């Protein structure tokens, strides 16, 4: 079983593979600068929160349609208990994303995101918004907001690292990616950090949502 930082390296694609990826990152950054300073950027941010909630929960098997999300935002929840739970998760995701944007703003905030404390904070920010009846996995196991998993897990064919090694793995993850904060390399590091955090699988539930919530 994985239990040491060197076992989840390399943390970036091989140099020979980076050229094409950096070119794509350059094109993305150039397109994004066209929105900088425009009022539309703020409007898009609000729209994207709803879109992000829709897609991340669909990926996680907690699908809600856009109309159902709009109804939940108006506190008009379904009489169906399962759908109502999905609606609560959808609006919790939207509200958590807004809070995270404020808390981790600016250059210093972007660096702070690459830390074990921030990873736990994001999990807590999302799941603390849910009522106790929603804080249970499909297997009936309790979900504690912000708590790293306390047992071993396997997701499909992937056996996640030993739970006792999570602090040291997250420390290495943060040290490495937090130092890459400039230009196209930062975008490449963002994608790699997303994948590696999923490999670590720090929580008993909600890992995908936590990985996708910060987009810095």
Regions found by a protein language model. Name each.
Residues 1-216:
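FIC/Doc superfamily catalytic core
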């Amino acid at each position: 079983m994985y239990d040491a930082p060197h076992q989840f390296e390399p943390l970036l694609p091989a140099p020979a593979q980076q050229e094409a990826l950096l070119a794509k990152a350059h094109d993305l950054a150039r397109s994004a600068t066209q929105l900088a300073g425009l009022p539309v950027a703020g409007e898009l941010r609000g729209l994207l929160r709803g879109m992000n909630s829709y897609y991340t929960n669909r990926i996680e098997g907690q699908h809600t349609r856009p109309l159902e999300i709009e109804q939940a935002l108006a506190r008009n929840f379904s009489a169906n208990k399962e759908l109502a739970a999905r609606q609560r998760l959808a609006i919790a995701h939207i509200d958590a994303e807004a809070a995270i944007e404020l808390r981790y703003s600016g250059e210093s905030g972007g660096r702070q995101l690459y830390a074990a404390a921030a990873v736990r904070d994001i999990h807590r920010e999302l799941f603390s918004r849910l009522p106790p009846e929603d804080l249970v996995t499909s297997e009936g196991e309790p979900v504690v907001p912000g708590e790293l998993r306390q047992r071993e897990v396997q997701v499909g064919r992937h056996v996640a690292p030993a739970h006792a090694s999570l602090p040291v793995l997250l420390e290495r993850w943060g040290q490495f990616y937090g130092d890459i904060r400039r230009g196209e390399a930062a975008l490449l590091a963002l994608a790699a950090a997303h994948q590696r955090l999923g490999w670590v699988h720090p929580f008993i539930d909600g890992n995908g949502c936590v990985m996708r919530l910060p987009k810095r």
